[in-house]
Regions:
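N-terminal catalytic or cofactor-binding beta/alpha core of small enzyme domains
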Residues: 1-141, 152-161, 181-234
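Short active-site-adjacent structural elements
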Residues: 15, 144, 172-179
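Active-site glycine-rich loop that binds ribose-phosphate moieties when present
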Residues: 144, 148-150
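An accessory alpha-helical subdomain
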Residues: 164-174
Length: 235
């Protein structure tokens, strides 16, 4: 049975009335893309609830693809984030009034986690369909980065793998005007929609090709389970 694609966005923050990631995510509500139903969830912009909310969503939705979207004012194109770091450092308060300075996302967690998106395929598909986009090697140290870090941690032992990524999106034109359009690029909602639709259309066939091989790997792993932290004896 086909699983779902989970797409998330964030509510407005910092006094803004809209958030481009929320607008983009909501535009996909109820859609069927490449045979997969798209499930949409909007997150409060609060650092303390990210882990708990994603943990709950993964159980409720049971997706095999998760795309978290986050607004990144100042960017001029869609940005796929390659890496999330175990750092929380931001001075713009979240919607609970919280800031972070030199903190970590997860105590004892890995320094960084790498997204398993097929980056080159997606960017090539974007460019072929006229969507400006690129791969970013820095998701920052705010809540967007935290989202990707938490998601990768929550899904790292899933078999078959859950394909997980963070998409940073620019301001919408109205936001850029309010912020001072001479120094704040923007992108139309229609172009953002084309971008995330193309992203999903590119990922789903790739996921379906990977699933049989991932299942074989999982079955092979059951033949000899080695607890984490225990090395196999050299032969």
């Amino acid at each position: 049975m086909a699983k779902h694609v989970l797409v998330t966005g964030f509510e407005p923050f910092g006094g803004d009335k809209i958030n481009s990631s929320e607008m983009l995510a909501r535009s996909l509500e109820g859609r069927l893309i490449s045979g997969r139903s798209v499930m949409v969830r909007i997150l409060p912009f609060e650092t303390r609830t990210v882990h708990e909310r994603f943990e709950q969503m993964l159980v409720e939705v049971d997706p095999d693809v998760v795309i978290s979207t986050a607004q990144a004012g100042g960017r001029s194109a869609l940005a796929l984030e390659r890496v999330a770091v175990n750092v929380l450092d931001f001075d713009t308060p979240d919607n609970a009034g919280i800031t972070r300075t030199g903190d970590v996302v997860a105590r004892g967690g890995a320094d960084a986690r790498i997204s398993n998106l097929p980056f080159d395929r997606i960017v090539n598909a974007w460019h072929e369909s006229g969507v400006p986009g690129y791969v970013s090697n820095s998701a920052g140290t705010a809540i967007g980065n935290q989202t990707l870090y938490e998601l990768l941690g929550l899904t790292e032992t899933a078999a078959p793998p859950v394909i997980t990524g963070l998409l940073h999106v620019p301001y919408l034109p109205a936001q850029a005007i309010n912020a001072g359009s001479e120094s704040n690029p923007s992108m139309s909602l229609d172009l953002m929609k084309r971008g995330i639709e193309t992203l999903i259309e590119t990922i789903v066939p790739w996921v379906e090709q990977r699933t049989p091989e991932a299942t074989k790997t999982r079955e092979a792993g059951r033949q000899m389970w080695i607890p984490r932290g225990v090395k196999e004896v050299e032969r």
